[in-house]
Amino acid sequence: MTITPPALSVFETLESEVRSYCRGWPAVFDRAQGARLTDEDGHSYLDFFAGAGSLNYGHNNPVLKRALIDYIERDGITHGLDMATTAKRAFLETFQNVILRPRDLPYKVMFPGPTGTNAVESALKLARKVKGRESVVSFTNAFHGMSLGSLAVTGNAFKRAGAGIPLVHGTPMPFDNYFDGTVPDFLWFERLLEDQGSGLNKPAAVIVETVQGEGGINVARAEWLRALQELCLRQVMLLIVDDIQMGCGRTGGFFSFEEAGIVPDIVTLSKSISGYGLPMSLCLFKPELDIWEPGEHNGTFRGNNPAFVTAAAVLDAYWADGQMEKQTLARGEQVEQTLLAICAEEPTAQFRGRGLVWGMEFEDKARASAVCARAFELGLLLETSGPQSEVVKLLPPLTITPEELDEGLRTLARCVRETA
């Protein structure tokens, strides 16, 4: 496919230099459906990006679109703060019946604001309030958001530098396999906790991603996550799982921690929780932690009722019968087999992932960007991941068809060959 660079003048002259994704994908997109986007010139692109994980069910999913249109056409509440509404009630009841009860999860539900970093900030605030401590432990290559509290537990040096002030009360520890298996799990962490001279203040909580999406598709082993939960219990620290990108079915189960059999004290959800790409986030926590005073944490747009409508619809449509998890794992197997074949032909590459999130890394760290650039030329949207953008990240919609997935994987294989 030959793509003529579009007229981007208004974006280049008026919009801030902070824009990023559009620099790698120089097109003006006009419409989208399922796993495909179309630009204003009629070029079609297969989407292996899915709105950075916000579009697990594809673009303009017809089931969700119908529910949203019906709600708007009857003049349903749009802006509701934390007032009781029929849309919020329907979502809460559906979430409880379809997600929480079948998994025997007792969580209370908080609507902290519309974005993922709102959810993380509320989780950090609550953990500190409950424990009466300031420090929170995070992990190397973590990403938890771009506001100050979230940045303090984020690893990426470039993003941290944007804060412009010291980021305090966050301490990084080695993520799973950070030392390539040469150091026992949590050796350093436990030594610091037990040594009164280590200089580590007793943490209120530990925050972790089961798969580090922005950090390079680093996958924590189930046994590592179980050991982390046991460590938190022994040391009386709360365990926070940031499931903003890896939750809502991305790794197979609705929650990414289900495979490990752990029950975090606090869970953050956003991105695909609304199902339609509408802003929405949740902070879930065990009932005994619900010590908030009314209004102690709030936000103008925490009551985004159209998002509640699509969120309830997606749970009914995709999670009530248990088929979504099976389908995602089957699609993941399809990806894994293709990546095995690609890496067999490309000895400098390796891959890792779970469900429908995968990463491919090359010895030449610049190769990932070259692969993604060539993919765009061929009509496939891929992004990079990792602190040096050294990983090609595959994040297609969960609803992608086997044929579309195969098409995208064939394009990926071609890009790997052509950038060698």
Curated annotation (Swiss-Prot):
Q: What class of enzyme is it?
A: transferase
Asked if the keyword Transferase belongs to this entry, the reply reads yes
Where N6-(pyridoxal phosphate)lysine occurs, residue numbers?
A: 271
Q: Name one Pfam family in it.
A: Aminotran_3
Q: Which UniProt keywords apply?
A: Aminotransferase, Pyridoxal phosphate, Transferase
Q: Which domain of life is it from?
A: Bacteria
Q: EC annotation?
A: 2.6.1.76
Q: Per its UniProt record, what InterPro entries does this chain match?
A: Aminotrans_3, Aminotrans_3_PPA_site, Dat, Ectoine_EctB, PyrdxlP-dep_Trfase, PyrdxlP-dep_Trfase_major, PyrdxlP-dep_Trfase_small
The cofactor named in the record is: pyridoxal 5'-phosphate
Please name the GO terms that the record assigns under molecular function: diaminobutyrate-2-oxoglutarate transaminase activity; diaminobutyrate-pyruvate transaminase activity; pyridoxal phosphate binding
- Pathway participation: Amine and polyamine biosynthesis; ectoine biosynthesis; L-ectoine from L-aspartate 4-semialdehyde: step 1/3
- GO biological process per UniProt: ectoine biosynthetic process
Q: Which family does it belong to?
A: Belongs to the class-III pyridoxal-phosphate-dependent aminotransferase family.
* Name under which the protein is recorded: Diaminobutyrate--2-oxoglutarate transaminase
